């Protein structure tokens, strides 16, 4: 697959929305994860854009979870959401 600015922009947009790179790479529109990492090794600007998009994506996920927490849940759903929130919060602390 050939790297293009349009493809990289779509990749960045999806990362900003909180989608994991592994999920995005399964989409036929995108190359596999190893190809994306290869591009990043060769292109410092792309690498920086992707890292910033991933940081933004974590904040997007925090916002989504904060929204979800406003809706009443069963105890089991609450436990799952709490675990998910803890993981996202941990990611945010590592990327900050």
Please name every model-derived segment.
Residues 4-5, 9, 13-88, 92-96:
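Charged, helical or coil segments that form electrostatic protein-protein
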């Amino acid at each position: 697959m050939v790297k293009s600015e349009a493809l990289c922009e779509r990749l960045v947009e999806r990362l900003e929305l909180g989608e994991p790179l592994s999920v995005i790479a399964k989409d036929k529109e995108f190359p596999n994860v190893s190809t994306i990492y290869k591009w990043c090794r060769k292109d410092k600007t792309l690498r920086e854009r992707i890292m910033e998009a991933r940081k933004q994506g974590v904040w997007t996920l925090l916002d989504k979870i904060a929204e979800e927490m406003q809706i009443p849940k069963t105890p089991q759903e609450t436990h799952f959401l709490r675990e998910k929130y803890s993981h996202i919060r941990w990611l945010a602390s590592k990327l900050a």
